[in-house]
Amino acid sequence: MEKALELREKIVEIVKAKGPVLPVQVGKEVGMSILMASAHLAELTASKRVKISNVKVGGSPLYYFPGQEAMLQKFTASFNDKEKKAFDLLSQNKVLRDSEQEPVIRVVLRDLKDFALPLNVKYNNNQEIFWKWYLTTDQEAEKLIKTKLGIERPEEKIKKEEKILAND
């Protein structure tokens, strides 16, 4: 029992040190089969000590430590053209309005679970889906969504700031 806990701690340290890893890499490091390494990684994922990606490399998911999400971008080379287009569009714009996207992009965004976070926004009794780039802060996303909805335009914000400064 103690040996299994020691082994899990070693696996956690490997994931922490190497970033997103495949079960085969962990297996080689600790000298066990891919199947056993996968089982230990699954247990660590269930206990929320390690995260699992939706991105697959050769059919295997990547395992990573909380805070290493940005490192998942290294594994997007295997994306097909549609996935790459949606990935690039979202990474450049930070927030996308679902209803403004081409149907193929809308479908792909739903599959890019590691990078595209859905936000259900209620506005004027309507509910809309927006997609947030996974590294975008909630505050930044809120500003961008408000701009897209016409709640606050960048010019209005500048004018508000000018008025505040003029009153000082």
Predicted regions and their residues:
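Basic amphipathic alpha-helical segments that dock to polyanions
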Residues: V26, L41-R49, L90, L112
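Exposed, interaction-prone assembly regions rather than primary DNA-binding/catalytic cores
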Residues: K85-D168
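Short, cationic-aromatic polyanion-contact patches
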Residues: M1-R8, L22, N54-F79, L109-F115, ...
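Short acidic, hydrophobic short linear motifs in intrinsically disordered regions
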Residues: A17-V30, G59-F65, A70, A86-V104
